């Protein structure tokens, strides 16, 4: 007898696919134009010479105490621009448009010094601006992810943004980077025969009290 053909399965699965880029970490980088770094550099050295520094993330070098207000004349133009940039940047990712400058400080790293891994708790955005920073061995700025990706020691650990554990940037005079304050970051040893000078800062909710601002 003729064998019965098996019935074809005519059911098809329909997939509606959608890509979700969840938990992305935005960074904003620019080269600052229109800011005279020479008076800022002079201010940084004068501040170092007349005030006692602190040890927080710095290993060697000089780290000023946190500064709230008033902003010195040498930095008013710079911080006015920073606040505008920060709110534009933050508006694109959160809708927040009223961040204000919280605290800021000066870092002077002579040869052989560096800044260890740290974050800036209780702030919303953090940033760093390099006032004087030249040379291939001046020390890279390193930002790190903190979601256990380091446990996946596989061939997938590539330079893909999805797989990398950290990202290194070689700063230069005029380099500005802003990022979410919870991002861990560090700065490598300065191996040049000159100082590395930077100004770091935090931007916060305008209703946040000064004593709540994040520390380095």
Residue ranges, per PLM feature:
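A short coil-to-beta-strand element that immediately follows conserved catalytic motifs
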Residues: 94-104
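Catalytic core of non-heme Fe(II) oxygenases with the double-stranded beta-helix
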Residues: 106-178, 188, 205, 209-214
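Hydrophobic residues positioned within well-ordered beta-strands of beta-sheet architectures
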Residues: 28, 102-104, 125-127, 197-201
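Non-heme Fe(II)/2-oxoglutarate
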Residues: 9-96, 114
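Ligand-binding loop in jelly-roll beta-barrel domains
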Residues: 187-198
């Amino acid at each position: 007898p003729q064998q019965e053909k098996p019935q074809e399965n005519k059911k098809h699965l329909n997939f509606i696919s959608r890509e979700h880029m969840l938990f992305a970490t935005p960074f904003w980088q620019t080269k600052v134009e229109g800011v005279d770094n020479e008076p800022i550099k002079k201010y940084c050295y004068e501040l170092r010479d007349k005030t006692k520094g602190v040890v927080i993330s710095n290993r060697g070098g000089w780290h000023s105490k946190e500064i709230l207000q008033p902003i010195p004349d040498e930095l008013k133009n710079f911080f006015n621009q920073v606040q505008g940039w920060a709110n534009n940047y933050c508006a694109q990712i959160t809708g927040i448009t009223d961040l204000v400058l919280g605290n800021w400080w000066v870092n002077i790293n002579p040869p052989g010094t560096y800044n260890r891994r740290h974050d800036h708790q209780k702030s919303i955005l953090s940033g760093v601006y390099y006032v004087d920073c030249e040379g291939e061995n001046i020390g890279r700025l390193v930002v790190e992810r903190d979601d256990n990706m380091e446990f996946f020691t596989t061939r997938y650990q590539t330079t893909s943004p999805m797989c990398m554990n950290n990202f290194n940037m070689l700063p230069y005079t005029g380099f500005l980077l802003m990022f979410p304050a919870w991002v861990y970051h560090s700065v490598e040893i300065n191996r040049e025969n000159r100082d590395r000078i930077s100004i770091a800062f935090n931007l916060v909710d305008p209703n946040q009290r000064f004593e709540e601002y994040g520390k380095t």
